[in-house]
Amino acid sequence: MLHCSLWKKRWVRGLALGALYGAAWSAHGHVLPSALPPPVLHAAAPAQAAVLAAAPPRSDAAAKPYQMRVVGGLANVNQYKRWEEPFWTQTLPRLSAGRFSAEIVPFDRAGVPGQEMLRLLQLGVVPFGTVLMASLAAQYPRYTAPDLAGLNPDMASLRQSLAAFRPYLEQNLREQQGVEALAVYVYPAQVLFCRKPLSGLTDLVGRRVRVSSSGQADFVEALGAMAVFTDFSQVAASMQSGAVDCAVTGTLSGNTLGLHRLSTHLYPMPLTWGLAIFAANRRAWEGLPPDLRTLLRRELPRLEASIWEAAQRDTAEGIACNTGARTCAPEQRGDMALVPVSAQDDRQRQTLFATVVLPRWLQRCGRSCAQVWNQTIGPARGLPAPTTY
């Protein structure tokens, strides 16, 4: 256990250094020498192999498991605690009878800037990792299309948008970034927690609203609010200090942060959901044993399905607990007022998406993205890209 602990500390330090130097090296067009040990364990060196060859054969039970290294999603939320971490540390060893295992750390505790995750996967600094789709808005805006603010008022709509976009997403990541997309996870609905009363979207005029993506910023600014970008870990402090009047975050993750004690009104319209891509550096992926790749191809879709089902449950549970449901634990039970989403607000959501969010995304993304949209999500949702933006 001591060896494992020391290895993890060195690995986390390596990730931090990789993130730091990766941006600098890539800015000059170089390939970064990995700051980590090789992505997966390799065969013994020739001298070791000679010794092993002379030694008596060991049983499979005595052999060390083949170990992967994974960077996961956000720490301290259900997706990581209940699904990602147990899958890699418990389910994988169980399904492989102990032959395969993995070490995993959440990216926000590994010194890895979220916006650099895809680049670090591309370089191989991170061999296997979870990429928050919203973090790609600046460098890779085209990949954020399925979860633009105001596009998906419910999970059925989100599934439809992702299904239409996924073939393009997987192909483009493989061909342009050398990254293999293996699963797409989802967080609970991202909704509004406010410290002051509101009756609907129009009441956001003049308020400072915490957001986590450019699309969310476009949406709230179109309503007359001021968008404030704040890391997830700083949301509660920003609400408590009065730096923001409202915060967009997950229904249950907001509860975990204690927002049910810091805010008074909950507006449950999903502005976004929060998609995350679990992906692998292609060389690291192809370097895995074939039977491990087969196992992961079979089991990761099952993990994905479980996470999506849990996100829907967590969305409902978060709303219930924030508003004082007796079925929730006392420490989770809030006293927030639940603001109903009116038909007028839903029409306004659709208008803002078509006239503000989608055109601004196209401005950031470029003209080719209009073509991508019109070949994927646009026809699936009946939302063609505007001809001028």
Whereabouts are the PLM-identified features?
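Hydrophobic helical h-region of N-terminal Sec-dependent signal peptides
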Residues: 13-21
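Short, solvent-exposed loop/beta-turn-alpha elements that line the ligand-binding surface or hinge
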Residues: 153-176
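N-terminal signal peptide c-region/cleavage motif recognized by signal peptidases
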Residues: 24-28
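N-terminal secretory/targeting leader peptides
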Residues: 2-4, 9, 17, 30-155, ...
